[in-house]
Amino acid sequence: MTPSFPPIAPPLYASLLEDEISRLTPLLGAARGALALYSFRGCNCPALMQEVARLREQAFRGVGGGTGRVLDMDSNDTNPSGYRQLVAWDAAHHRVVGGYRYIVGAECDRRCISTLHYFDFSPRFERDFLPHAIELGRSFAVRDAGASSLFAMQSLWQGLGRIVARCEGVKYLFGKVTIPPTFDAEARRLLLLFLRRFFPARERLLVARKVFVPPSGDDPFTESRYEDNYALLEHLLRRHGERIPPMIHAYMRLSREMQTFDAMVNPDFGNAVEVAILLPVDSITTAKREAYIR
């Protein structure tokens, strides 16, 4: 934890969380690891929102990031026109074990969209993409949740798939992926180079207001097959003591049609480097579609 950060807020009584959970309809009933999925607005479930904000800050500080506040919560989490929260709930242990926040472009107050605080949206993105998109962000899984943590992210992806299937007209997922501030600088350069090379932006739809430009260096990705370059990236990152960040890894496996845009340093998130992404839903691999979107 960064020494200057104040302590994270203490957990709330489980009974407060259970009371709010009991008033929600499960998006997906308890399955593997006894997890159930729920979606809610922070303004309607203040105790759950506080617990999610506490767990987010705890998770992000654990990798050198975080907001530096006692809770990772902003006005967009509590605005009735802002984000909805998706959580994985471990009923056996009465706790939240993972979460995402999401916002549907066609029905939101655009001022609540986190990506818009750091990236300018092109007129074409505003017209042709945003009304058919869901922004995703702030994903986390609780590390000390035992077996439940192993299923949390998979369960959350199933929940997101259910949301996509229910939201008529949704064609795109977008948002920001994060490289922790503690990530080795050369490993970060290689990862950003790989993303630009193999997941390039086809046009300037999302433009960072203050672009992060990594230092120049050698380009080792000269193999003809994507799979060989991917294996090389993993090898090079390991040499620097790093791995592909989990969410970047997940999106890379979700679709080869993902586009990555500018990188920027987020001063509100521990100076982590974040990259804007856009992913067409119909480009998601068949295996992932069958597993998650139904």
Residue ranges and their predicted role:
Residues T2-C43:
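Conserved N-terminal entry element of GNAT/NAT acetyltransferase domains
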Residues G29-G98:
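Short amphipathic alpha-helix that is part of the acyltransferase structural core
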Residues N44-C45, G105, A141-V142, T178-T182, ...:
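Short, solvent-exposed loop/turn segments at secondary-structure junctions
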Residues A47, S149, T285-R289:
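Short, conserved charged micro-motifs
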Residues T67, E107-M258:
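Acyl-donor binding region in acyl/amide transferases
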Residues R69-S81, P181-T182, N266-E274:
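Beta-rich nucleic-acid/ligand-interaction surfaces
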Residues Y100-A106:
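Short beta->alpha transition motifs characteristic of CBS
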Residues Q259-R294:
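C-terminal/domain-terminus segments
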